[in-house]
Amino acid sequence: MNTGRPNQNLCAGTRREFLWQMGAGFTGLALTALLDQDGFFGSVANAAAPASTPMSPRIAHLPRHAKSCIFLFMYGGPSQMDLFDYKPELNKRHGQTANLEQRRRAVSAGKLLGSKRTFQQYGRSGQWCSDALPRLATQMDKLAFIKSLYADSFAHGSAMLQMNSGRIIQGWPSMGSWLSYGLGSMNQNLPGYVVMLDPRGGPISGAANWSSGFMPAAYQGTVFRAGGQPILNLDPTSGITAPMQRDLITTVNTLNTEHLAKHPGYSELQARIASYELAFQLQTTAPEALDLAKESDATKEMYGLNDPKTDHPLALGPAPFGRQCLIARRLVERGVRFVQIYHGGGHQQQNWDAHNGVEENLKIHCPEIDKPIAALLADLEQRGMLDETLVVWGGEFGRQALVQGGGDGRDHNPKGFTYWLAGGGVKGGTSYGETDELGHEAALDKHHIRDLHATILHLMGLDHSKLTYFYGGLNQKLTGVIEPEIIRGLLA
């Protein structure tokens, strides 16, 4: 093939022959790799066909409070009683033996472990925060806490899937996919759903956490790397000019569209048409959106980009979480609908899974997130973006009140844990719900995580009962078949 003349005899063979030939020289976008990775050569989900342009903006069901959402996911399960859920009774009874009911766990009795952190009330609202997060403590009046969440799984993999997709098994669309499906994207030149991972490793269950499940692949998350070039394979192959590549993609999409007209239920192909067009646009838009050199030195300092406390030895660049928070702000500023940042990777001490010692775990991870999150909230506010951006913080579950092992470790606990929300439509300076006096189990105003999902959808302008996708003979919903309750106490 003569790459200098891409229009010569482009349609001489069959469509499949054309795609196969182009796979060898489709520039850095790697057509064949994209087709294979996205399952083009495999089976196609038997789902309803999406709209002709899957990511076109859609009208919300409700008066929308927030236009975008940034989900800060603390992988491993942060310890609520060492960060936000102050439990003086637990501290008083430190070292005493207690029998605490557990489901599907071997340990139900042991010694209570009080927190070594110092708690203080902050802001006009008097919200409790420990000394592990001194910068974030200054933002307490922006946060709405739900301290009585509970979930169904003690295992990281299934708990993460449930927090992301509402189910403890793979194959279901993630919340970002539901938002993309329900609202579309405000910027057709950037992904509507972006995921940024910790350079220490991706979370357990991997891409299933940001999968579109049985929905078209157009709604799945696009992963940005933590360091170096965030999106691989965007640079054109040497000798291929922008007009040549534009002609090439137009021809591919024309052939795909003709094929789609004959096979209207082929949702994977429809997603690929949109993906190739987006990939071409990303070659121009992504470098600008991700260029932190355009930010002022004061902004970089605010996010901790030059602060060694926000760094860690396995990073691919300085202050990865601070960089990701700043990139998240730049993305929502440009109309990206949903950005999810995972903090914590690998195993145990590389994430929030504090089996071997909660104090050491907090000393590692809290400085990495404290300054960047406080900066993100303050930056969104000073730019007038906080009212239209929903920020969500939390993990897949919390930690137990009992000590694990011979030190100061804590085991998993889905029976009672804390999340906080800030921004669009949220009543800042609020603490809703309570765990028991030991922080072990949700006790007052208990809410299953399906209620959190319904609340997030509501804040984004979507009615959980109307946001449905027909699959398997049913109108499927993020919140499942059990009717959820919107957590009204968090709403402004």
Give the location of each predicted region.
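Ligand-binding pockets and gating/stacking loops
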Residues: 1-492
